[in-house]
Amino acid sequence: MAATLATMMCLSSFSMMNVWADKKEDSEPLVINYISARGETDAALKTLKKLAEDYKKDHPDFEFNVESIADRETYLQKIKILASSNELPDWFDADPEAFFEGLCKKDLIYSVDDLYDELGIKDKFFDIALNYPKLSGGSNYLMTWQGNVEYFWYHKDMFEKAGITETPQTLEDLLDVCKKLKDAGMTPISAGNYDMIMRYPAFKAFRLEGNDFIDNARMGKEKFNSETGIATAQYTQDIAQYFSEGWTSSDTTAQMDLFLNNGAAMLYTGTWDTPDLVDDEGNLKDDISMFKLPVDSEGTATGENDYYANCGIGTAILKDSMSDEMKDFISYVWDNFADTAMYEFNMLPSMMPSDPEKLPELTQQIL
C-alpha cells in the first residue's frame, strides 16, 4: 500500500511538473509595440525606456518597441488610420476625448480601473492621476505618468531690468508687466503654436466661471458671444500682442529654447518641462522663478490657489494585448516608476516617490 501511494505521489508530482513545463513552453515572450505622442527627450518616455531595459535583464526575450511621433496632428492621424484598419498597437497615447471614448465603447481598450485594482496599486496615485483621464461616464482607460502643475516661469533679471519689482497678482497686472517688458525692448512671452497656446483664451473664462464656461461651450450649451465669451476674446487679443515674433510657426522645443536663451522674459508651461528649467540637483536655475496664474480683478469663481493641473497625455492598452506577462511588466513599471522618474529624470510622477524628504525644494513646493 505504501509503495503504491509513493508511486501515485511520484506520478502526480511528475504530472504537475509536466503541466507547469507545458505552460512555460506555451508562454510567448512579451513584445510591446508602443506608439507615443511624446518626444524622444520626454522624461516620462525616458523613464519607461529605462525601466524596460532594466526589466529585460531578467526577461531576455522581452521587447519594448517605441515609435515616437511628437507632432500631435501627425500622431493623431496615424492612430485614427490604425484604428480604422484594426491595427492599433499594444500601447498608444490618448486623451479622454470623443475619439478615444469611441474606442473604449467598442471594447477595444483594457480598463485601467480594473488593471489598478488587479495589481493593488490604485491608492498609490495622486488623485489627479486617477481623475483627470476619466471619460464622461467616470471610467478610466488610461495610465498616466505625470503629476503636472502649470505656472508662468520668468527670468528675474529681465523683470528687474524692466523695473518690475513684483510678480503680477491679477490678469490685468499681467498685461501691465508685459507692456513694461516690451517698452524695455524685451519679448514678454515665449509662445508656440501647439496645444498649450489654448490656455491663454481659457485664462479669463476660468477666472470668471471656473471650468463651467469651457465645459458648456464644448457641449454646445454656451456661446462665445456671451458676456464671458466676449471678455475672453478681448483678453486673448490683448495678451497676444506680447507673444514672441513668429509664434504661429514655433513648436514646443523652439518655445523653450527661446526662453532658456533669454529671448523672452516669460514662459507658460507645466512641470513636465522642469527638466529643462532645473539644475543637476533638481532646483530651479539661478535666474528662473515662477508664479501662479493670476486672479481676475472682477471674477470670483476661482481664487489664487485654483490653477491648472493635469497628468499629461495618458497611455492606453489594447484589450487583446493584455496578458499575465503584460501585467507583470506593468507591475514592475509602477513599482519603480516614481523614483526613477523623479530622481533620475527630474520629472514629477503621477504617484509619490518612496522618500518625499529627498525631493528637491522645487518639487516639495509644488506638492
Give the residues covered by each predicted segment.
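Long, aromatic- and glycine/proline-rich binding clefts that accommodate carbohydrate-like moieties
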Residues: 291-295, 342-367
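Conserved N-terminal structural module of periplasmic/extracytoplasmic solute-binding proteins
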Residues: 2-6, 11-101, 105-106, 119-123, ...
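Extracytoplasmic/periplasmic solute-binding protein
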Residues: 136-145, 150, 175-221, 264
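Short, solvent-exposed loop/beta-turn-alpha elements that line the ligand-binding surface or hinge
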Residues: 111-125, 209-231, 279-283, 292-306, ...
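Glycine-centered hinge/linker elements that transmit conformational signals in sensory
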Residues: 178-181, 218-249
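Alpha-to-beta junction loops
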Residues: 82-94, 108-110, 185-188, 261-270
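Extracytoplasmic/periplasmic substrate-recognition and gating elements
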Residues: 30, 53, 57-58, 63, ...
